[in-house]
Amino acid sequence: MIKTLQNTLKQDKEIFTVPRSVQDIIPIRRIWPDGVFQFGSKYSKTLRFSDINYAIASKEDKTAMFLSYSELLNALDTGSTTKITINNKRLDRRNFEQEILIPPKGDDLDGGRKEYNAMLLDKVTDSSNSVVQERYITLSVHKKNVEEARAFFDRTVHDASSRLNHMDSHCEEMDAADRLHILHDFYRVGEESEFRFDLRENMKNGHSFKDAICPDSMEFKKDHFIMGGKYGRVLFLKEYASYIKDSMINELTSLNRSLMLSIDIIPVPTDEAVREMQNRLLGVETNVTNWQRRQNSNNNFSAVVPYDMELQRKESNPAIGRIG
């Protein structure tokens, strides 16, 4: 295994303790008003970013966007981890009516306002438009204290924001209340408009921030979990296919369901990545040599190398060139 990946997994490993309450299930240990969270020995910071028009872009623009995305990933610091999250959540009708609809003003234009509001409500009640999508990028790093973590985030957050802006994606940092609101909506589906949190007031009264976001109950079964009366399930991709369409993520997140899709990224130094690919290529060549030796021992001197071995050999050589 790659050394950096092995060290990261080792640092993330924690001793499991049986939770005594629903609050104990939430892994966050401490929060700060600026949005820095501590979980275990790691600190994290989250950015919210807007979507880009990739699906309708031309082939040249898609290539440019893909290369810009690659530059963003390559700019991430080794030793840190990054999580890209796409959050599909149900649109809260009461909140929509309060924030989006135009209130009547008692003049001659109220008829137009009423008609416009009816059109918006008709759009929202349609099942295909009842789910809104938000996107986040979360940076996490192991540091000795929050001051060192803030120094790291000051640099990396600015770099990530500038690269996202270069892709025409608006980006904003999220404070503690914003991040807790996301967790509240996840843990308390159907109660999105009931989120109330004042960090200063909580500290004054000695209340835990977890009380504001945790569900009433949480149960974990063999293949699903029950959270506040709602049933859920976690799926993960154990292995990737050799070819993945660029529309795969869009197809997964276009489901009309409340879901969170996360992509975890662990940056690896170039020299370690090249060494790993060279070892894999050496393994492929060894398999080919052993196969040919077996064929020769059977007096089969004209045998063609199996297609899967030849394909592995062809894919490994260009991969080393792209990494280096």
What residues fall within each predicted segment?
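Extended, folded cores of ATP/NTP-driven motor/assembly subunits in large transport
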Residues: 1-324
